[in-house]
């Protein structure tokens, strides 16, 4: 190194001797973008235009560079390293000085300086917390300045900034690079009950019951609630002077007996970390009273009956008081704590409305029960005992009834089918028969009117004179070629065949019976394909 070095600021030259202190040199090099350390004799081929042009020309010509991390981060109180490496080129250049600077709002503040001849200097604000990592640099006269990484310890929020590592070289000039340092503040999280005593009063009002707070965090935390309790949450952020943020959230509910002993969980998320805290609500409320012991079956002479006053309260009930509406309590009772014992058998005098009042420090509530006394026990039907023999006899009777019902149904069906089959044709089995409408005739032909008996037999219960009646006159029918005997077998038949159209005339003029309008075939008749029927005897022949 030459005895004299020249610091150029703009187009002006400043000379400083080599024996000057580091602090004096540091003051000269505070504006790194404008001041360069170069020899008085310029290298051949370099033309000075301005400081930036010189820097670019040296970079292009020699290829020196400074390597740093793009960014670094740490929490308050932690230790972090800011790397700075100098990559020399060919031919190599000579490192005259290394300077670390802090850039805040466009202003540069020197942090540490390493000079091969003058040693290492750390400025006062960082003196106890910043040091060079490489042992060769920490020597009184640094032997190597190619690795000038610094170590930040006990980080503070004020350390957050951009830091510049600048190398002053000969004859290449200055090389620099920058690293951004971010400082995080881990918040302090806690959850508390809003009030040590939460009271459910009348009228009911909403109130905050728990508070979750994440204080002095950077960046701010996110708070959520996890609970089955119905309510709503409020959130508030406060920015502190040091750059941290305090987040506060209250959970608001309507205090009641149902909210007592409910669990509230606060979930705080800070970056990738998660914190949880829980509280159990302690809600004080008036007693909830219910009287038990009356089962609706207090009958005369029933022994050992009692009434119990059960109260759900927080804090617990301290006083129980019994009374009977519209009267005084019977003489045969004994009160122990919350129970009313009735001595002796039940009588009608025990009936009435019993009231129990329960009192705690929050208030007094009451419950009542209406006691009715009956003469006989009220035994539910499903609880009555049925003898075993009744069970067996009932099963037998049920089986018998079921069997009889099935038998009757079978007989009815059999009778029905038999009666239908008994409706047969009452003629003889002589010749082939044809069906005409609803009546029958022989194959020889159909007369104008079927032969009718001259006398009809009246039923025995008829009111008219029971004697044969002559059918004659203009309204009568011709007897044809055949004479009928009043005592013949044909007249004793209950029906005879007529044409359907003529049957109406018979109904109007005679006492003849009406018949089924549908043709019926006897069991000894066989139906033919042409619509006729013949007797089985003729069919087999």
UniProtKB/Swiss-Prot annotation:
The keyword Transmembrane applies. Residues 1-21 form the signal peptide. Residues 479-493 have a biased composition (Basic and acidic residues). It comes from Danio rerio (Zebrafish). The keyword Repeat applies. This is Nectin 1b. The chain crosses the membrane at residues 397-417. Pfam families: C2-set_2, Ig_3, V-set. The gene is nectin1b.
């Amino acid at each position: 190194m030459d005895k004299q070095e020249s610091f150029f600021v703009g187009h002006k030259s400043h000379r400083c001797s080599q024996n000057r202190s580091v602090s004096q040199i540091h003051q000269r090099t505070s504006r790194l973008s404008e001041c360069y350390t170069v020899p008085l004799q310029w290298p051949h081929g370099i033309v000075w235009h301005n400081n930036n042009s010189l820097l670019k020309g040296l970079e292009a010509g020699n290829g020196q560079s400074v390597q740093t991390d793009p960014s670094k981060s740490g929490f308050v109180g932690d230790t972090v390293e800011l790397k700075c490496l100098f990559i020399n080129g060919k031919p190599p250049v000579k490192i005259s000085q290394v300077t670390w600077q802090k850039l805040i709002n466009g202003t540069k503040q020197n942090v540490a300086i390493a000079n091969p001849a003058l040693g290492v200097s750390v400025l006062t604000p960082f003196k106890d917390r910043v040091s060079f990592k490489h042992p060769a640099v920490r020597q009184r006269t640094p032997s190597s300045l190619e690795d000038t990484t610094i170590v930040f310890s006990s980080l503070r929020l004020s350390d957050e900034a951009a830091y510049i590592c600048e190398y002053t070289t000969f004859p290449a000039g200055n090389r620099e690079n920058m690293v951004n340092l971010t400082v995080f503040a881990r918040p302090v999280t806690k959850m508390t009950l809003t009030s040590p005593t939460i009271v459910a009063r009348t009228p009911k009002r909403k109130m905050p019951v728990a508070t979750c707070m994440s204080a002095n965090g950077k960046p701010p935390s996110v708070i959520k609630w996890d609970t089955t309790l119905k309510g709503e949450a409020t959130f508030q952020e406060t920015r502190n002077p040091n750059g941290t943020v305090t987040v506060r959230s209250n959970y608001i509910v309507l205090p009641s007996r149902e909210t007592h002993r409910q669990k509230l969980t606060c979930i705080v998320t800070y970056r990738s970390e998660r914190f949880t805290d829980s509280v159990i609500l302690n809600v004080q409320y008036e007693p909830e009273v219910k009287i038990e012991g009356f089962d609706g079956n207090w009958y005369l002479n029933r022994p050992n009956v009692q009434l119990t006053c059960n109260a759900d309260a927080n804090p617990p009930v301290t006083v129980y008081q019994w009374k009977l509406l519209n009267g005084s309590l019977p003489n045969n009772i004994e009160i122990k704590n919350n129970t009313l014992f009735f001595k002796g058998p039940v009588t009608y005098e025990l009936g009435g409305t019993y009231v129990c009042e329960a009192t705690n420090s929050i208030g007094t509530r009451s419950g009542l029960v209406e006691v009715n006394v009956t003469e006989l026990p009220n035994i539910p039907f499903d609880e009555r005992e049925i003898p075993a023999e009744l069970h067996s006899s009932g099963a037998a009777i049920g089986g018998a009834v079921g069997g009889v019902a099935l038998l009757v149904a079978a007989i009815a069906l059999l009778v029905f089918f038999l009666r239908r089959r008994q409706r047969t044709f009452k003629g003889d089995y002589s010749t082939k028969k044809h069906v005409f409408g609803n009546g029958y005739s022989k194959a020889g032909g159909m007369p104008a009117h079927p032969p009718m008996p001259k006398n009809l037999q009246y039923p025995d219960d008829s009111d008219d004179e029971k004697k044969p009646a002559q059918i004659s006159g203009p309204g009568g029918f011709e007897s044809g070629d055949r004479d009928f005997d009043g005592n013949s077998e044909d007249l004793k038949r209950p029906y005879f065949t007529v044409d359907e159209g003529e049957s109406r005339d018979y109904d109007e003029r005679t006492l003849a019976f009406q018949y089924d309008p549908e043709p019926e075939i006897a069991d000894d008749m066989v139906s033919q394909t042409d619509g006729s029927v013949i007797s089985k005897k003729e069919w087999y022949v």
